[in-house]
Amino acid sequence: MSAYDVVILRSGSAAFAGAIKAAELGATVAMIEAEIIGGTCVNVGCIPSKNMIAAADLYHSVMGMQRYRGLSFGAAQVEWASLVEQKEELVLNLRKKKYLDLAEGHEAISILQGKGHFISLQQILVNEEVVTGRQVLIATGTRACIPAFPGLESVSYLTSTEAFMLKTLPVSMIIIGGGVIALELGQMFHRFGVHVTILERGPHILSGFDEEVARSIQNILQDEGLNILTSTTVTEVSQSDTGVTVRVHTHQWSNR
């Protein structure tokens, strides 16, 4: 049995902030992580998304300059595999600098690789070892909530995590939902040449935001070329030889 002052479940930004503060106050800390050190932000969230979005923005700007006579930039092209490779290198570097090296710099912080299970209020089982903490911090974060659309479980769907791990760019993509992550991903893939359709069940995208702002953003994205369908409900999802078919219903019509 190993005993610590503080035991923290997972190792994302919140977990590390808690671990460092506890160590600075003189506590011994154990962080339990079943997957990759660093959590969502550095591995599959903020860092990789902003890196790829910045690349898409730059490519979009270069392509837009073609409408000016007298400006020549050669044949701009997207090498998706190389973009993904440099994104992964950035993630690996930041994970090491901002998380692994930081933890190793504190003698009071230990990282236990494995899945933790509570066996009492202060005892957690990790890899058949019991870890005890006077205080336990649960910093497990969140994961994508998969809607129960008929047929969805039988198709090869993506979450935002898998979207950034694609080995090749798809010809087309349907994004269900019109929230912030859906829009930034949709615009990014569109700028890389993917035909993107966004399905939003509400009357406009960004349903939790000011309507005037949301509609302005919707107009901008549609002018850029994204296909956005609002007041649209998904009724069925199915796999086909050419990809995934999504059947939808709107107030006016039903279509695939």
For each feature predicted by the language model, list its residue ranges:
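Glycine-rich flavin
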Residues: S2-A3, I20-A27, I32-L169, G202-L206, ...
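Generic alpha-helical hydrophobic packing signal
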Residues: S11, A23, Q123, G133, ...
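Internal, well-ordered alpha-helical segments in soluble enzyme and binding-protein domains
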Residues: I181, L185, V213, I217, ...
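N-terminal Rossmann-like FAD-binding beta1-loop-alpha1 element of flavoenzymes
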Residues: Y4-M31, I175, I181-R191
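Rossmann-like NAD(P)H-binding beta-loop-alpha module
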Residues: S156, K167-R201, G208-F209
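Residue-level marker of alpha-helix boundaries and capping positions
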Residues: L9, L90-V91, I176, G208
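Glycine-centered short loops/turns at secondary-structure junctions
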Residues: G26, G193-H195, G225
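Short beta-strands and strand-loop turn motifs
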Residues: A81, I198-G202, L229-S231
